[in-house]
A protein has these predicted regions:
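A detector for long, heptad-repeat alpha-helical coiled-coil rods in eukaryotic scaffold/tether proteins
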Residues: 81-84
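C-terminal intramolecular chaperone/autoprocessing and neck/assembly modules of extracellular spikes
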Residues: 1-77, 91-103
Length: 103
């Protein structure tokens, strides 16, 4: 059986306007701190993860800040995907330029 959460995000062009290419994403992706840490609740280790407070500075759209300060911040990893894909596209374009210079 499936143990994850399945969800879809509406992305139909008919619901959008002012559509343009997104700005540079590589710098902001490079600014995201990927951390290793241990969870206080059970001591389990995460080799790769984020700290919501740090991510909030770079990608605020990916962090849910609760109304009450005693509640925990939550990261929506799906909101990071477009930024990461844009950064990969930029790297791919840079690689193509470098290939042309070598040849």
């Amino acid at each position: 059986g499936t143990t994850g959460v399945l969800y879809n995000i509406t992305s139909d062009q008919r619901l959008k306007e002012n559509i343009v290419d997104a700005p540079n994403a590589l710098d902001s992706v490079n600014a995201i701190k990927v951390r290793s840490f241990d969870w206080k609740s059970d001591g389990s280790h995460s080799e790769y993860g984020y700290i919501a407070q740090e991510l909030l500075e770079v990608a605020p759209e990916a962090v849910h800040v609760p109304a009450y300060p005693e509640e925990m911040m939550v990261v929506d990893f799906g909101k990071l995907t477009p930024r990461i894909i844009k950064a990969l596209q930029e790297l791919s374009a840079e690689i193509e330029i470098l290939k042309q210079k070598v040849n």
